[in-house]
């Protein structure tokens, strides 16, 4: 085999990607570019061998979010390959969300070699710094070029990556300087592939298992402040663990509830199973109505706080103890700063708890009087909602939050975009998301990448329903440019209120109509049917819930991407919802 730079670039790219596949990468998004050619060509060859799935995206920003959606839905590492320069900067929004939502994703970026740095060379920037503030690690191969990198250096880089992801999941930036020539001849490629397949492909590598050691003293400190024989509440926020660990999380939660008999408030994206004993339906409305009457002095909080002002007010004024258990998230996670934080997850906490209490067999404790009262209150509110929200009603956002979980098949996954949908579903969905996987990216809680995230999820979990407002949707239309995106089984429920309706709720009373529109709502007169046709996406517009049910059945049956638009009158939405809330709070 020739020892030319092009051959070494290609071989090292094969070795690097092969090792990343061995630590869990199954899906790879490749973006266009010349500097990343050795990595892209190597990825293509590994795809031919059936080792990794590859999808392409011309927009790095969409690619980052698409990869993040795949990671969230699969529980496995995902990977994005980009060229150098501004391409790397476009990964930042997805890196921010991956950081805050603790999802494993690798950004593999090609760079210029050291000799071209800081001298005005074309398309050469300090890209190694672009993602450093949000990535768990920023690592590099030999700065003089990939061709000068040794095999053991690549192995070491991947071992560091695997250890970091296992310990504290999040984004990793691997910045790879590559010198010319970037392409490779057919003959040289054939020769390198023969060497790789003969020597490296089936080579065994040892990756040490990472043992997550808990802090027993911290646990004992927390236990001293808990009295499991007295009343309390379990609050489950957005789930930040791996989807592969959902079963153990829910089994641990079931044990915790059995030991305590406490009621459970579950966020729509908590991933709590719907058959958990003690679940309080309509808990946010129960809290809004009764927050001054809830008599307990201890709270067990799992994960970050839900997007509920009522809950935040309750926690801020709560005078008892608050314990916050996090899933491999080692940063502070309590904005009200009133909790004992435990970093090592619910499974670890329950394991230590059972050992400390010498419990071999759990005897299920009766529901506490507080649990019974809160559950009954939730059921009373449910009766009011059933009476006031029917399939005959005019479509509004809050009615969608209540009825869509009943119209969309109970086992099919849902993704909620940020802004209005997640808040409406928290208030009105009646635990309807708990029968299925429900996703919403609550790390940074932005509307960035909504479509690309949903398309990524739908590669793994489908048929998927995305519930999104119009601004969140158009913010990421480049998602349709991801390879075969229109062929994915994704149904988009497009809530068209001609602007950011959440700002209507926040600022309508304090601004003139023209100011509100220009500064916050930013309405766009879009012909949605023509927009869908431009991307060759199936489209329907519906005006009532009966037609919406039929549209859902149609979208699932055709197994392709579909946009179902519903128009919302913001004025009617606000007055209608306020009247309902007044009836509930006054009941």
Swiss-Prot record:
Molecular function (Gene Ontology), one example: manganese ion binding
Enzyme nomenclature, EC number: 2.2.1.9
Pathways involved: Quinol/quinone metabolism; 1,4-dihydroxy-2-naphthoate biosynthesis; 1,4-dihydroxy-2-naphthoate from chorismate: step 2/7; Cofactor biosynthesis; phylloquinone biosynthesis
Keywords: Magnesium, Manganese, Metal-binding, Thiamine pyrophosphate, Transferase
Top-rank taxon, per record: Bacteria
EC primary class: transferase
Gene3D superfamilies: 3.40.50.970, TPP-binding domain
InterPro entries: MenaQ_synth_MenD, THDP-binding, Thiamin_PyroP_enz_TPP-bd_dom, TPP_enzyme_TPP-bd
Reaction catalyzed: isochorismate + 2-oxoglutarate + H(+) = 5-enolpyruvoyl-6-hydroxy-2-succinyl-cyclohex-3-ene-1-carboxylate + CO2
Cofactor: Mg(2+); Mn(2+); thiamine diphosphate
Cofactor annotation remark: Binds 1 thiamine pyrophosphate per subunit.
Pfam families attached to this UniProt entry: TPP_enzyme_C, TPP_enzyme_N
One example of a Gene Ontology biological process annotation: phylloquinone biosynthetic process
Subunit structure: Homodimer.
Matches recorded under PANTHER family: 2-SUCCINYL-5-ENOLPYRUVYL-6-HYDROXY-3-CYCLOHEXENE-1-CARBOXYLATE SYNTHASE (PTHR42916), PROTEIN PHYLLO, CHLOROPLASTIC (PTHR42916:SF1)
Family: Belongs to the TPP enzyme family. MenD subfamily.
Reported function: Catalyzes the thiamine diphosphate-dependent decarboxylation of 2-oxoglutarate and the subsequent addition of the resulting succinic semialdehyde-thiamine pyrophosphate anion to isochorismate to yield 2-succinyl-5-enolpyruvyl-6-hydroxy-3-cyclohexene-1-carboxylate (SEPHCHC).
UniProt name for this protein: 2-succinyl-5-enolpyruvyl-6-hydroxy-3-cyclohexene-1-carboxylate synthase
Lineage, highest ranks first: Bacteria, Bacillati, Cyanobacteriota, Cyanophyceae, Synechococcales
